[in-house]
Regions:
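Short, Lys/Arg-enriched N-terminal segment that forms or immediately precedes the first helix
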Residues: 1-14
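Short, cationic-aromatic polyanion-contact patches
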Residues: 11-21, 35, 65-88
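Short alpha-helical "packing" element that flanks the helix-turn-helix/winged-helix DNA-binding module
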Residues: 21-28
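Short acidic/histidine-centered micro-motifs embedded in hydrophobic/aromatic stretches
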Residues: 27, 42, 97-98
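Short acidic, hydrophobic short linear motifs in intrinsically disordered regions
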Residues: 32-42
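Short amphipathic alpha-helical interaction segments
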Residues: 44-59
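Amphipathic alpha-helical dimerization/coiled-coil segments
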Residues: 83-115
Length: 115
């Protein structure tokens, strides 16, 4: 399994996001900011679907909409911890240090620095 597939699996398992959310989050990490049309080329999804998924990621605390239909991923470590905190709140689990989450944040930061 290659590195990016490992990251995708961890994102889906640990942060309870689906495959399309994972693809869009990683696409946003590749660029400082982008529109749905900017992501459309790489994802083969209609712009409306990309916007819907990006807004879902925004409610999960992982991205922000900086202009109409223009999104940016939060810093990898912040996005991961933010999402983990929300999962803990919803499931009434105490929020505490989680090595898997911390390591996932580091892996994403390294991924972002490589692209």
């Amino acid at each position: 399994m290659n590195h990016i597939n490992h990251i995708k699996i961890l994102l889906m398992e640990e942060l309870q996001i689906n495959n399309l959310e994972t693809d869009i989050f990683l696409a946003l990490m590749k660029s400082e900011k982008t529109t749905s049309f900017g992501m459309q080329e790489n994802l083969n999804l209609p712009p409306d679907q990309i916007i819907e998924i990006a807004k879902s990621l925004e409610t999960k605390g992982m991205v922000i909409e900086i202009n109409k239909n223009e999104f940016r991923a939060l810093h990898p470590r912040f996005a991961i911890v933010n999402r983990y905190r929300r999962i803990c709140e919803v499931n009434n689990i105490p929020f505490k240090k989680n090595t898997k989450i911390d390591n996932l944040g580091i892996m994403l930061e390294n991924y972002q620095n490589q692209v």
